[in-house]
Amino acid sequence: MSVTADDVRRIARLARIAEPTDRIDTLVGELNGILSWIEQLNEVDVDGVEPMTTPVKFPLPQRADEVTDGNCRDKVLANAPKSDEGFFVVPKSVE
């Protein structure tokens, strides 16, 4: 599979970005290079290899689940543009 200049224009239109008229030839080459690299990855034999998220296994520290109130209401409300009696004040969204 190879990318053409028309494909680059179509991708730009679908992504709703400005058509890169001065860089189309460069982008065609870059996208074809990426696709070539992906085709090389498809040739790797992975039969018998278990899917994994990381090659290094390290357990995450475990802790007991405890319900708390967070003790940071004032800090959180300090970030709000408007608050009243400990609650966020937002514009009315339903009539």
Swiss-Prot record:
Recorded hits in SUPFAM superfamilies, A to Z, give:
Glu-tRNAGln amidotransferase C subunit (SSF141000)
Choose any GO biological process term that the UniProt entry carries and state it.
Answer: translation
Which E.C. number(s) belong to this protein? 6.3.5.-
Q: What class of enzyme is it?
A: ligase
Q: Which reaction does it catalyse?
A: L-glutamyl-tRNA(Gln) + L-glutamine + ATP + H2O = L-glutaminyl-tRNA(Gln) + L-glutamate + ADP + phosphate + H(+); L-aspartyl-tRNA(Asn) + L-glutamine + ATP + H2O = L-asparaginyl-tRNA(Asn) + L-glutamate + ADP + phosphate + 2 H(+)
Q: Which cysteines are joined by disulfide bonds?
A: none
From the Swiss-Prot or TrEMBL record, what is one GO molecular function term? glutaminyl-tRNA synthase (glutamine-hydrolyzing) activity
InterPro entries membership: Asp/Glu-ADT_sf_sub_c, GatC
UniProt keywords (A-Z) are: ATP-binding, Ligase, Nucleotide-binding, Protein biosynthesis
The yes or no answer to whether the keyword DNA repair is present is no
What role is this protein assigned?
Allows the formation of correctly charged Asn-tRNA(Asn) or Gln-tRNA(Gln) through the transamidation of misacylated Asp-tRNA(Asn) or Glu-tRNA(Gln) in organisms which lack either or both of asparaginyl-tRNA or glutaminyl-tRNA synthetases. The reaction takes place in the presence of glutamine and ATP through an activated phospho-Asp-tRNA(Asn) or phospho-Glu-tRNA(Gln).
Description of how the protein assembles with itself and partners:
Heterotrimer of A, B and C subunits.
Similarity comment: Belongs to the GatC family.
Q: Which PANTHER family does the record cross-reference, listed alphabetically? A: GLUTAMYL-TRNA(GLN) AMIDOTRANSFERASE SUBUNIT C, MITOCHONDRIAL
Protein name, per record: Aspartyl/glutamyl-tRNA(Asn/Gln) amidotransferase subunit C
